Amino acid sequence: ICKMPRQSGKSTTVVSYLLHYAIFNDSVTIGILANKAQTARDLLGRLQIAYENLPKWMQQGIIAWNKGSMELENKSKIIAASTSASAVRGMSFNIIFLDEFAFVANHLADDFFSSVYPTISSGKSTKVIIVSTPRGMNHFYRLWHDAELGRNEYVTTDVHWSEVPGRDEAWKEQTIKNTSEAQFRVEFECEFLGSVDTLIAPSKLKTMVYDE
C-alpha cells in the first residue's frame, strides 16, 4: 500500500512493474483498476506505449490489443476497468493494481473487496498493489493505519514530496501560493485530513484517530 504525493511517478512505476510481470510470467491475469474507467484505460495506454518501446527481443506476440485490455502470446492478460465495473467480478487475478483508491466511494470499495478479494487471497503468489494520495479519513486511511500497526498484511511505502527531483522549499512556497496550505498538506504532504467543508475543523478530526 503506497501513500504518495501528486505527480511523483507512482502510477508509471507500478505500470512498469506490471509490464515486466506480464512478459516474464506465462498465463497470468493482471487487473488495472481505478476510480474511473477512463483513468484505468489511460494507465493501460501507458503500459502499451512502454511495451512498444521495448527491444524487439523482449516483446511477446500480441493476441489482443485495445483500449480496455491486451493479451500477449504467452497468454498473459492485462485488463483495465473501474473498481465498480461488473466485468471484474468473479475473475481470477494474479495481481490487482488499485490506483487512487482513496477516491473510490466507501461503499464501492467495500463491495469491491467482498467480491474480488477472495479470488486474490486464494493464491499463494498473488498481489494487491494499492496506490493513492490521501482523501480524508476513509477506507484508504483505515487500510494504511492498520498496515502501520501490523493488523493486515499490506507493506507500507511512502514518498515525501522533497524526494521528487526539482521540488524544494521554494517550489513548496510557490505551490501553496497558487493553491492553499490545506490542499498542499493533503496532495503533497499526504496528510489524512478530514473531509473539507465540515462542521468540525479538519485539524480537530485528525486528533480523533481511528484505532479499532
Residue ranges of each PLM-predicted region?
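Walker A/P-loop
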Residues: 1-17
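Conserved H-loop
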Residues: 4-7, 35, 133-135
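Catalytic P-loop NTPase motifs of RecA-like helicase/translocase cores
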Residues: 8, 40, 88, 104-108, ...
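Conserved SF1/SF2 helicase motif Ia
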Residues: 21-41
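Inter-Walker segment of RecA-like/P-loop motor cores
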Residues: 41-94
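ASCE P-loop NTPase helicase motor core
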Residues: 52-53, 59, 103-179
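ATPase catalytic-site recognition across NTP-hydrolyzing enzymes
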Residues: 111, 162-212
